[in-house]
Amino acid sequence: MLKELKRIFADSYVLIIFLLSGLLYPVIYGLIYYKGTVDEMPVAVVDLSQSSDSRRFIQKIDATREVDVAYKCVSMAEGQELMEERKVRGIVLFPEDYGDRLARMEQATISTYADMASFLYYKNITMAVNHVMIDELRTIETTRFASLGMTDEAIAQMVEAIPAEENIPFNTNWSFLIFFLSAALLLVIQQTMFFGVSVMNGSMREGKATHDGSLIGRAAAYALVYVGIACYCLLVVPALFKMPQRGQLPDLLALIFFFVIDCVAFSFTFSRFVRHRETVFVELLFMSSLCLFLSGTIWPVSSMPPFWKAVSWVFPSTFAIQGFHAINNAAATLPMIRPQLIGLISQFAFYSVAAFLMDYRERNHYESRLHKLIEKRTRLIEGRIKARQAQEAVFEATK
């Protein structure tokens, strides 16, 4: 373990990844999304329908907290020009047949476009349109039932048979910071550990060397470093940005422990496929976005196809993010996140066995190669000795 710790602190690239990235990235993400919400975001509306239905929809959108209808355009090109000039952060498009399709009792469509410079813009325009759409569905159904001669009481029972109201106990103002930063914190831990371990392995392969310490000792070195980083990310940073911290400390520490050892086993397994230390930075851009979407934070797990749900089980962050959301935001206890803990422990067992087998194979390969090299050098030395002895014999014979 001590040898691996010395290697970690002797490699400047690994120190940058582990310490600088692990400590600064959570703070940077928190500062970017500190407010968590954007109110009255300017949008442009392109109403090609010019119907009473589209005008009513636009009025309701403008009344929401999330967006402000700053411009009404006659064409999509005009709306795109406004977005390029950064005068608006989104566009809502009503097609020409919007009112006609509703009149024919057919499904109508509304298109939304958001400036993806920030997820907040996408969230705002999507939430505003979805809330108004749900309200419009009630209005359309009420109008259609009234045209059939139904009474107000019967219409109310048909439109809303079970009265319901929106109640969001753990994120009342739909703050983006609460659910995004919670996921980002765990991704920082997983990704920086994987990239740091991959850089170390890439350096060893480029030098045609192998690890001389035991796998358990090396794993303990990384776990020791990252327990501190994980406690900083999951305990200090949420308090720094005044995020909800409803969970009990022992439950959070247990989740941190299982997540860290799972990340160590995951990193030791997949870092074997990294041959050069520079290639790992290319994987950073791909893996981070993929893990975020597969965690269930932005893309609901219930809506994932079976294939992508299976892919999400590859990464420790999937189970850890779900468990951290439940503990930190909803005050869940360890028995309540039993499926996530089982997932982390199962991953740890699988990746540990895989890492041991790959390490055993690599050591055998290295020892075999070293043995062959020694035999080759021995034969070469023996050949030189025999040649020297032959030369000496010839020299003695010529005297």
Write out the residue ranges for each language-model feature.
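Structural signature of transmembrane alpha-helix termini at the membrane-water interface
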Residues: 5, 27, 31, 35, ...
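Juxtamembrane loop-helix boundary motifs flanking transmembrane segments in multi-pass membrane proteins
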Residues: 1-4, 71, 117, 156, ...
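Extracytoplasmic/periplasmic domains immediately adjacent to an N-terminal transmembrane anchor
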Residues: 2-176, 360-361, 365-399
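Structural motif marking the loop-to-transmembrane transition
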Residues: 1, 5-16, 170-181, 212, ...
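Transmembrane alpha-helical segments that form the functional core of multipass membrane systems
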Residues: 178-295
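Transmembrane alpha-helix boundary/anchor motif
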Residues: 23, 27-28, 124, 192-196, ...
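Membrane-spanning alpha-helical segments of multipass transporters and channels
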Residues: 232, 247-399
